[in-house]
Design a protein with these regions (language model features):
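N-terminal signal-anchor module of multipass membrane proteins
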Residues: 1-30, 249-255, 265
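Membrane-interface helix termini and inter-helical loops of multi-pass transporters
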Residues: 2-4, 117-132, 234-242
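C-terminal ends of transmembrane helices
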Residues: 25-35, 78-91, 147-158, 195-203, ...
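Alpha-helical transmembrane segments of multi-pass integral membrane proteins
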Residues: 20, 97-117, 134-153, 165-179, ...
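Hydrophobic core segments of alpha-helical transmembrane domains in multi-pass membrane proteins
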Residues: 13-21, 67-79, 182-194, 248-252
Length: 273
């Protein structure tokens, strides 16, 4: 049963997320080659199989434990967005600053648009969201503590004019725009751009530009096809708008976990970018 009707700008936001935002993660195939995981056909097949397996596990976990899955996804997003906009550093302040930065966006969108976001969360994870909101309140409290810690250690944590400008842009986005357009604008134009502009020079130093682009297109197309198949299966029971929301965000969650493992766990620490 359909719970809500999305507005026109929400549909444009979802289309942008699917066709502009998701392809930034499709460079993971090229990243695996750069890391040496796909030098041989056996390694390529093993990497792709493991990537798909992890994504499948995330989807199944979401089906059986939707509220816990959403909680984990949101907190993973805090760190992934936060760290993704920062230059990698082997520092105890790196995770702290990442939590602050990512939390500003994630918690900002949520707590500035609680009624709209609650509807989206109910579509994604059902009606009983008390545990989710308790976790978010706790996460926001920890975020406030991170703000004070950053102010306390401000001599150790350098806040450049460029970074302060980025914070102002993010604040403008989450204050002025509805939640889905705000997420789309940040995800497509800030997070995706920072990711691609950081990794691309390293990728093309290990392979031809054409190969990196073709791998990205291949991974993107595969993701879109799988999403379309999933959309077809849930359309009858969930309705048009709800199906798009579910496929978009559960799909992003399923891709974020292997993407984070590869990028934040191996690629960026190795190349220090």
């Amino acid at each position: 049963m359909e719970m809500s009707v999305l507005k026109l700008w929400d549909y444009w936001a979802l289309i942008s997320i699917i066709f502009i935002g998701i392809p930034h993660g499709a460079f993971d195939g090229a990243i695996s080659i750069t890391l040496g995981y796909s030098k041989k056909l056996k390694l390529q097949l093993a990497f792709i199989s493991m990537y798909i397996f992890i994504a499948f596990v995330v989807i199944m976990f979401w089906i059986y434990f939707p509220v816990i899955a959403l909680i984990l996804f949101l907190f993973l997003s805090v760190f992934h967005f936060g760290l993704g906009d920062l230059v990698w550093k082997n520092s105890k302040f790196y995770l702290l600053k990442g939590y602050f930065h990512g939390g500003l966006f994630v918690f900002g969108i949520i707590f500035l648009n609680t009624s709209e976001v609650d509807i989206i969360f109910k579509i994604l994870s059902g009606e009983n969201l008390s545990l989710l909101w308790h976790a978010l309140d706790t996460g926001a409290f920890i975020w406030i503590i991170s703000c004070f810690l950053i102010l306390f250690f401000q001599k150790s944590i350098v806040l450049t004019k460029q970074y302060i400008g980025l914070i102002c842009i993010i604040l403008s986005i989450i204050i002025l725009l509805p939640p889905l357009p705000a997420f789309a604008l940040y995800f497509c134009l800030i997070h995706s751009w920072n990711h691609v502009s950081r990794i691309y020079p390293t990728l093309i130093s290990y392979m031809k530009k054409r190969k990196a682009i073709l791998l990205m297109i291949g991974f993107s197309t595969t993701s879109w096809i799988m999403g379309l198949i999933g959309y077809y299966f849930i359309l009858e029971t969930d309705g048009f708008s709800n199906s798009i929301l579910k496929i978009t965000f559960i799909g992003i969650a399923s891709l974020t976990v292997p993407h984070m493992i590869l990028v934040d766990g191996f690629f960026r620490p190795k190349f220090k970018i």
